[in-house]
């Protein structure tokens, strides 16, 4: 349910090409995850089942991608199933794109057929291959590289947060312009326009499932930044001599609200370690640090909190994790 990203290197004509891959949740309840990380992307892979076709949640995520002008590469998975109907599914995807008002460049989408279980992908459904090369070739061919200028003043957008008990808060995002180096002084521009001075203590880049320390990143790179203690989702990390904010992350408003309060039944305090209103408040405040789609407001009394989210599933998972 959380967006994750990785990076792989693919050889094209003997030249290594770095491809950053961001996996987003499909359910509309976690739309906040989708909306904030789509700002990192230059294109999208629309993964559909060769039997089920586009699902209801496909419409939500695809609509958000089209709003940002991302061109889809359609990947039809599970074509090895005996009941697969790959060609019909491609037509259903086209109809969905038309319904969502996609532009002409999105309607002329390339199609890759694959079997994730057997580990192969192909442009021609009648030709079975032995690897997933066709997907990476489609990405390099169809998705334009980032339009980024490393000579301009630094601009980077933070779209998600991580936390490490040793280094504290870690801001994850993309450099849109300029170059950022380890030890560099930067200005953090908050969503409300205020600025905070800070220092980049460490820069991490993604390599497979690992994070690798690097000395610098330039325009177009995705990275994780250590040392920016006051950074939040949607903040711009900019050069101190020319701090210009990037458009912040827009997230749709919550659709339902639930009342959270301490257990005041006759069985209160008999189980559970964190049972006071102060502890509940601290936990909800911690959730707000990385969950941009959630809102918390005080209730009628000091031990009540009105928690708003996208749906029953997102609030239910919050309750389980608490």
For each feature predicted by the language model, list its residue ranges:
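Structural and coupling elements of P-loop NTPases
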Residues: 1-322
